[in-house]
């Protein structure tokens, strides 16, 4: 639990200035982050496993096909679009047995059996041709090594997790919550995005034809849209957009804001 709390707090602090709008929300999140940092760090130091500094790469066998990825517990996932499926774990030698990779019901689950702190690296490299859903939680981070293309893709980040992806997608759906962050680049025809509980989604460099955005509870969304834009912001959340959409429907209440950042 310690490393999860630390990752959550660090990510919230990193995105703090971007998404805090209301004074009440600001005070609440300050207190929450302080609690997470104090208890998270102490718990992590007591219960976590420290890396031995000897980094090795372990090639893992993939027993079954998968179309989804679910990663957690502070691990860093690097995804490469490739016709050749492969899986490698790059981490301190004494941490290798703690990092588990298992395919169940079409989902590749990547996690750790114990808290990890002070590691030289804890990377999991995944190569696959087709992925339609990516979930990251509990301080995990996912990166695309090259442009990832798909007809449809769902990205879900929660509990201080991060997603940094370069995409070409027909139907893209993204959801961020609980202090998570996303940074997206590329193109999408249809883009549905929602953020809550202090999460931050930056898609200024992702050009969407049509976009439906919903932000609440001190979260922040940035998008670029060219055709149809529907936006709703509530409870101190903010939505900023670029791209001069031809049709825009904007709704805001309880301290929420929807603003164009272009003249």
Where are these predicted regions, by residue range?
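Short, Lys/Arg-enriched N-terminal segments with co-localized hydrophobic residues
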Residues: 3-24
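Short acidic/polar N-terminal linker immediately downstream of export determinants
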Residues: 2, 26-36, 42-96, 109, ...
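Extended, compositionally simple hydrophobic/Ser/Thr-rich segments
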Residues: 59-60, 66-79, 123-126, 131-262
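Short, solvent-exposed coil/turn segments at beta-strand boundaries
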Residues: 104-106, 130-131
